[in-house]
Design a protein with these regions (language model features):
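Short C-terminal tail/terminal secondary-structure segment
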Residues: 688-704
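Residue(s) in the substrate-gating loop at a strand-loop-helix junction
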Residues: 580
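Alpha-helical segment proximal to the catalytic Tyr-Lys
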Residues: 565, 609-610, 685
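Active-site helix of classical SDR
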Residues: 560, 596, 604
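Substrate-binding pocket helix/loop in short-chain dehydrogenase/reductase
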Residues: 536-537, 541-549, 657
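Short, small/polar-rich loop/turn modules that mediate ligand/substrate recognition or access, typified
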Residues: 526, 612, 617, 687-689
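Active-site loop immediately N-terminal to the catalytic Tyr-X3-Lys motif
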Residues: 538, 585-591, 613, 664, ...
Length: 704
């Protein structure tokens, strides 16, 4: 239960973090002018107190040699469209003839031509540079300074989004900071900026209301340190104001304990995800950081959240406003259904109010950000990275609201302006240029026994097709190795790991709860955890018998039991059991193993019957003699199987299995992974209760 408090309780608000200069003369020494621009850009972009991911741009006006005339010409180097300042390389900069850019003013006929003006930018390209120039290019071109930074620091956007922001800017900077009212980026803003700077000599920067700040310097270092200093001074001023009173009207809802927040998130996220209908599946992200909890627990939370985010960089990721939920009604499915339906209706009304004949069709109307007092912030998007970034952008918005309300009233953008940005033709063109999603994009998988050869190969194949994967295994060391390897290949966002012995009911439950909390739900279960034993029946102990059944039958049962409610809620899911040739074909000296595999195969068939009405498909892949990378084949099983056939356990055993197959081919973990991929994909959407043998051909295992 959430705890309601007296709003007058508590101390000052959480502070802003002020940036500090990280410039290194040693690192900068000897760099060329373009490399100095890159160094400065990477420093700025890697500091989240300076700008958000993908936000902001930097420039330098440098001399270049015209490849046709051989004459020296001024060239604007400016961060191109897209990309991220913190991680960009030199090829991320656009290069344009400065004289041609300045000459475009003669073609500009007013704001009605803004979109058309973007089409002229490629005609100014220097050196056949393919990096597309951004809409912010005029802001850099028309300023007379050699080095310019345009960034989106929370501390300065707090000023830019507050009724008291302009007065605060005067108090902080005196005559050193200019102020321009909200205008969309483009030529009009670039020309206004030029004229404002000309009319106010001595400025070090200009606050762009509802947007960010632009500042400059005579060289790369001076520009960087000016930017850092302006942001740090704003943060210090805000912190002095924030220390005087609690943020957001004071706390009225206390956070739950961390473990309770985690449990609530694991329970809520699959239910929300199942209700977010649309053409594309969604992946979730949960955060319960201190700043979010301070915001959602505040007396003014609902009012401020409804105003919406003010900075375009924020709401392009988050939608203009979040959905807020009553923490006391999270177990009420009817309430959740009504809340999401209401949000969609509100978004559709926003679209209808503002859309014109030539605007793009309405996009997904589901909420991106969901806020719950006492619990935290949930974000949903087409993939894990986008969901995480949406959460980070909303955290920026919370910072802005906290600072803005310390100075006056928080100001959001007008409905019409927000719509004009969200459905801007240039933004739509950017979305249309994005690559098509991969076949498993938006899907979440859990793989048991993921540290072994088959499990790791399956996880890698699912990740390669766009899925998020929870790796589980009982061996902590090899599980961490698998996580590290897959993270190196696919990045950290889509990969998680949970230590799990499939024979331990509590650990299985915890792994599925972690999957729901980390990704929002479950679409795919690959039950692969295994072991193998070999012994004549008279030497098979009860302990050995039970061990096989514990892992290969009970372990698959426990995993499936946890998967069913998660998949059933959304009316869709795919389960694949990794079986064995021995499930269909008898083998000597392995009665415990073979009969357990047969039992798990029949369990899969039973589950296919139960799952069909819920949209859950259950199929089996039966491999044989997958030796490479196998933890099972590295142990006693290899020696015992060789002994059963009277052959050497080394290369002779591998040759024996290869030559025993009808196709005379080795079976590799990647071969099994391909079969799994097929069964969990839409290509097999009408397949359930089936068995695919991946054994290079074995007549004994032919299904009958």
């Amino acid at each position: 239960m959430t705890t309601v408090l007296d709003a007058s309780a508590g101390q000052g608000a959480l502070p802003f973090v002020a940036p500090a200069s990280r410039w290194s003369d040693e690192a900068a020494r000897g760099l060329s002018a373009p490399d100095l621009l890159l160094y400065r850009s990477n420093l700025l972009g890697s500091d989240l107190t300076v700008t958000n991911f993908g936000g902001g741009n930097t420039s330098a006006k440098l001399a270049g040699r015209d490849p046709l005339t051989g004459q020296e010409a001024p060239v604007l180097w400016v961060k191109g469209s897209g990309g991220d300042l913190g991680s960009m390389k030199l090829d991320g900069f656009s290069t344009l003839y400065l004289d041609k850019l300045l000459g475009l003013e003669g073609l500009y006929g007013g704001v009605a031509q803004e979109d058309a003006m973007v089409g002229y930018l490629p005609h100014c390209t220097f050196g056949l540079n393919p990096s597309a120039a951004s809409i912010d290019t005029p802001l850099h071109a028309y300023l007379p300074f050699a080095h310019v930074d345009h960034v989106h620091p929370d501390a300065l956007i707090a000023l830019a989004a507050s009724s008291g922001g302009e007065a605060a800017a005067r108090a902080i900077y005196g005559d050193q900071m200019g102020w321009l009212p909200w205008k969309r980026p483009g030529f009009d803003l670039g020309l206004r900026l030029r004229d404002h700077v000309a009319a106010h000599p001595g400025l070090r920067g200009v606050v762009l209301a509802g947007h960010g700040v632009i500042c400059w310097g005579d060289d790369a270092k001076a520009c960087y340190e000016n930017t850092i200093d302006l942001i740090a001074r704003a943060a210090a001023y805000l912190n002095a104001r924030l220390a005087q009173a609690p943020a957001f009207g004071g706390e009225t809802v206390a956070p739950l304990a961390p473990t309770d927040r985690a449990q609530a998130a694991a329970a809520l996220m699959p239910r929300l995800r199942a209700l977010m209908i649309g053409d594309r599946r969604k992946v979730g992200h949960f955060s319960d950081d201190a700043k979010t909890l301070e915001f959602v627990g505040g007396r003014d939370f609902a009012r401020l959240a409804a105003i919406g985010t003010s900075c375009p960089d924020h709401f392009l990721r988050t939608k203009i406003a979040p959905m807020a939920l009553d923490p006391g009604r999270l177990n009420d499915d009817a309430y959740l259904t009504e809340a999401i339906a209401g949000y969609r209706e509100g978004y559709a009304a926003y679209y209808e109010r503002n859309a014109g004949p030539g605007d793009p069709a309405m996009r997904d109307a589901n909420p991106v950000v969901v806020l719950v007092p006492g619990i935290g912030r949930f974000t949903f998007a087409a993939d894990k990275t986008t969901a995480r970034l949406a959460g980070e952008f909303y955290a920026n918005a919370i910072n802005v609201m906290r600072g803005a309300t310390a100075l006056g009233d928080y100001l959001g953008l007008a409905d019409s302006e927000a719509f004009a940005i969200e459905y801007w033709a240039l933004e739509e063109a950017k979305l249309q240029r994005m690559p098509r999603p991969k076949p498993l994009a938006g899907r979440v998988a859990l793989v048991t026994g993921a540290a072994g050869g088959i499990g790791a190969a399956v996880a890698a194949r699912l990740l390669s097709e766009g899925a998020c994967v929870m790796l589980t295994d009982r061996d902590a060391e090899t599980l961490e190795d698998a996580r590290r390897n897959l993270t190196g290949l696919f990045g950290a966002d889509p990969v998680r790991a949970s230590l799990c012995d499939v024979t331990d009911e509590a650990q299985v439950k915890a792994a599925f709860a972690a999957t729901a909390r980390e990704f929002g739900g479950l679409d795919i279960l690959v039950a692969n955890a295994g072991l193998a034993s070999s012994a004549p029946i008279e030497e098979t102990t009860l302990e050995l018998w039970r061990k096989n059944y514990d892992v290969l039958v009970e372990g698959y049962f426990l995993a499936s039991r946890e998967a069913f409610p998660l998949m059933g809620r959304q009316g869709d899911g795919a389960i694949v059991f990794i079986g064995s040739k021995n499930a269909l074909a008898a083998t000597p000296n392995a009665s415990a193993y073979a009969s357990a595999k047969a039992a798990s195969l029949h369990l899969a068939r039973c589950l296919a019957l139960e799952g069909a009405a819920k949209g859950i498909r259950v199929n089996v892949v039966n491999p044989d003699a997958v030796i490479r990378g196998s933890k099972i084949w590295d142990g006693d099983w290899r020696r015992d199987r060789a002994g059963a056939y009277g052959i050497d356990p080394g290369e002779e055993l591998e040759a024996f299995y290869r030559n025993r197959s009808l196709l005379r081919r080795d079976v590799l973990p990647e071969d099994v992974a391909e079969a799994v991929l097929f069964l969990v994909s839409d290509a097999a959407s009408k397949s359930t209760g089936n068995v695919i043998n991946v054994d290079a051909g074995n007549a004994q295992a032919f299904t009958r």
